[in-house]
Amino acid sequence: MTNVTPMMQQYLKIKSQYQDCLLFFRLGDFYEMFFEDAKEASRVLEITLTKRDAKKENPIPMCGVPYHSAESYIETLINEGYKVAICEQMEDPKTTKGMVKREVIRVVTPGTIMNQGGMDEKQNNYILSFIKDGATIAVSYCDVSTGELKVTKFNDESMLLNEITTINPNEIVAADQVSESLKQQMSLATETITVVDEISNEAYEVNQVEDTLMHQAVQLLLDYIHHTQKRNMNHIEDAQVYEAIDYMKMDYYAKRNLELTESIRLKSKKGTLLWLMDETKTPMGARRLKQWIDRPLIYKQAINERLDAVSQLIDRFIERDTLRNYLNQVYDIERLVGRVSYGNVNARDLIQLKHSIAEIPNIKALLDDFDDALPEQFRQLEPLNDLLDLLEKSLVEEPPISVKDGGLFKQGFNQQLDEYLEASVNGKQWLAQLQAKERERTGIKSLKISFNKVFGYFIEITRANLKGFEPADFGYNRKQTLSNAERFITDELKEKEDIILGAEDKAVELEYQLFAQLREEVKAYTERLQKQAKLISEIDCLQSFAEIAQKYNYVRPEFSDDKTLDLVDSRHPVVERVMDYNDYVPNDCRLDDDQFIYLITGPNMSGKSTYMRQVAIISIMAQMGAYVPCGSAVLPIFDQIFTRIGAADDLVSGKSTFMVEMLEAQKALTYATEDSLIIFDEIGRGTSTFDGLALAQAMIEYVAETSHAKTLFSTHYHELTTLDQSLECLKNVHVAANEYQGELIFLHKVKDGAVDDSYGIQVAKLADLPDRVIERAQVILDAFEEKDKPQPQISHLQQTESFVREPEIEDIQDKKEPETEQFQQGAFDLFETPPVESEIEAELKKINISNMTPLQALNKLSELQNQLK
């Protein structure tokens, strides 16, 4: 680019170093953006796009935002997935000759936000790194705002996506190029993926991580954080090594289907298990609760420690209520400490910190009064009286937001500051006396002494009072003329102004220095404060468990040694809350080593899916250490929960409903153990009747022979109910419904035995389908029912051959049923179809839906619709 100004050369040089960012380039009171950055920012921020050098041949696109309100604009860009590099003026333009030095002081990315306004206080803001060495993968993640830092590794690539969707980072840093297929999977969590070419040789203190690959993952993450933030991040904790196998494993689809933290329909917290269980009083407790939901425990001792604490808190209602009041006065200590370390803390933040640590002695005294049922670590709560005293004697109770305008410190904290403030106060008293004296001397009652930053102090007289007034007679020198007034100064006023403003400026400057010193003193307490914050967050979670247990009549779960699951009067905790509690129908469930598969039949809308989900959710709550919605509950400890619930295409990867169903089933069949829980909701409905029936039976048999996992399997293939004759481990149950005077009444009660009717037409009537459709469907159904129904094959488990035997070609040929094909064709012939529709029917028969993506199916449907027009 020719004829570029020196300032624009400076911009282009800096921009070349931050090509993946929008560059906020400081010019005076604005951050300016140029070229493509300006086009992007103006579109997203909805601000005016202008041009620099508009009269030249190639004007430069340009837009800008005021520096004093830039944070809100940055927040908007970050929420849209952009990175923003903040380029500041490093010299005062007023005192600098030539070009002002500028440099990027920080890069704000989705995973490194430190501004409180840009974060949900109840959600962690994680940034994650991963690094691969052959089949081994190390993952490290950090919440820069709180300092939490963890690392793990595993040898199964499928676990990478599980960890990413569990951690749900806002940004991912990779050491190598990421394949498009992996990017698609990662997009379930974030679109912001940064590839770092090399890891810095700069040594960070990660000596506590001995494993080489995990050490590199932490190094990669810290290197990126320091590169973007360009300052010491002393609040980031030592990396905590953890094992993913130490927690119950649930993949993304299981968590989504069970609606643990986000509802499927609204994509919000409301209507989820997190929404139900969140009776926390602190932001730290709310974040900890989500972590506990995402990672239920698998060790009985740790679970029972939590349950013992919950029991104590339930039994002592008055103390729990007092504890909740104390916690309600505690602010977000974790993020306040992060802001102290980062350097963007203000005086109001420190007042919040003061109020928070003032509650620690109260919380400690209350918990010390409990018996030994509370976990031992809660005895480690530490009153930080020395820090409390420091903050109490230093800062005023209601300081201004800005730390550069003074008014922060109490009188008596610093002698020099007191002297400056006294000079300023005395000077203002003198100004008030001068104003009264001048009013009397001039006889102008409306005369006033005012101040602005341009002219300093001045005497103002309205134009109406200037008639016959001679300023020189009173020693007034004209300073400024306004439309309705004149402004004057006097020698005496000017002399006093220098004294007053000198004292004020010195006081403000000294206060800023004192605040910086105070911030450093508070920073020394970082590790102790973080420890207290962690303990308080755990206490908050446990009292939340106790609160919901007592409020909703939950019971303490027991854990069986023989892997028995026995739930009496179990309820879905969320469903019963969004409906009238008294209307909810509780149900039992018993599975053990001898009978570990429930085959569940019943009409649509009868509650089969709710019943299966509630068993899974109760298991999760129990292993979190919470009470559960049951009359009584005995459970095994599950290592994994697998779900296949609902019908949904995977539009991201172009997989059909049936393919998604099969992939989720594959995970359960491949990885489930005898300690796992499987929930299969109407497997096989995405394909033809015979294919679906065959696959459903084969899956049931596979679980029965291999993993022996506890399994809830709902189906509308009533032919499968005969499997209880060949599989002793399978029990038929059904969700009851009655038909009364042509109307279907759902009882929502799970009873022993099978049903042979799904009441599909009755459910269709409830949906108010046209009467003509209902009547026609009944005629066709009657015709179907006159023919033989397809029957499942005798279970291979009754035969001597192994499950893995592949059928011979002759076996498959022998199973062709031409009579059934003729019957199906005859059933369709019952419709009186016009000729054009017969052609479309023929076209439909050629389509193999199982091999189509959703987009291909929509295109084909559009093509057929056009033929009908």
UniProtKB/Swiss-Prot annotation:
The keyword DNA damage applies. It comes from the Bacteria. One of its GO terms (cellular component) is cytosol. SUPFAM superfamilies: DNA repair protein MutS, domain I, DNA repair protein MutS, domain II, DNA repair protein MutS, domain III, P-loop containing nucleoside triphosphate hydrolases. ATP binds at residues 602-609. The keyword Nucleotide-binding applies. Transmembrane segments: none annotated. GO terms for biological process: mismatch repair. GO terms for molecular function: ATP binding; ATP-dependent DNA damage sensor activity; damaged DNA binding; mismatched DNA binding. Gene3D superfamilies: 1.10.1420.10, DNA repair protein MutS, domain I, MutS, connector domain, P-loop containing nucleotide triphosphate hydrolases. Keywords: ATP-binding, DNA damage, DNA repair, DNA-binding, Nucleotide-binding. HAMAP family: MutS (MF_00096). This protein is involved in the repair of mismatches in DNA. It is possible that it carries out the mismatch recognition step. This protein has a weak ATPase activity. Belongs to the DNA mismatch repair MutS family. This is DNA mismatch repair protein MutS. It comes from Staphylococcus carnosus (strain TM300).
